[in-house]
Regions:
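Mature, structured domains of secreted/extracytosolic soluble proteins
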Residues: 1-176
Length: 176
């Protein structure tokens, strides 16, 4: 079967709506071959769209990623090619990006409106708590100590993209 980790790890094509997220994983040194460092077992990911990440990078809203941008052709890279991320910036970016992955051992199934996944609090890979809400016709997530409720994109009728090692949803804003 196909793997969520592999799909993200090998993504080089800007046409994929998760391309920018995959490139942030690479910039944070989280990719090892076809796997994502630190992810084990089943995972549920909430992935900001390329457009969301492009705007967030331009606004310097992503911790550890101030030196990154999305170019006109849609590729993600350094603002100044001679000035890569420091190890501290990579650690900061990794800690932030890890917020978007839920530990699936704490999650009963793929989530969609009406699924078996209960409203409640779930731990993410940064060790922070995500508040998950099934609103009946839509889904939302929020960092427990965060200020922003993030809506899951309805573009695909709130159904997740499923893989043998997990699933993901798109979101159209950042966790703050």
């Amino acid at each position: 079967g196909s793997s969520l980790q592999k799909a993200l790890a090998i993504c080089q094509d800007t046409r994929y709506p998760y391309y920018c997220f995959a490139q942030l994983l690479k910039q944070a040194d989280m990719i090892s071959g076809e796997t994502i460092a630190g992810l084990a077992g089943r995972t549920i990911a909430f992935i900001p769209t390329n457009e969301t990440l492009k705007n967030a990078l331009a606004g310097k809203e992503i911790p550890g990623a101030d030196k990154l941008m999305v170019y006109e052709d849609g590729t993600l890279g350094l603002i100044d090619s001679g000035n890569g991320l420091t190890s501290d910036e990579k650690i900061e970016l990794k800690k932030y990006i890890s917020n978007y992955f839920l530990v699936a051992s704490s999650v009963p199934s793929a989530c969609y409106p009406g699924s078996k996944m209960e409203n409640g609090e779930y731990v993410n890979y940064s060790g922070n708590t995500i508040v998950y809400k099934d609103l009946g016709t839509s889904l939302s997530i929020q960092l427990k100590d965060g200020t922003k409720v993030v809506q899951v994109s309805g573009k695909y009728n709130y159904f997740p993209f499923c893989y043998n090692d997990g699933c993901f949803h798109f979101i159209e804003s950042l966790l703050m």
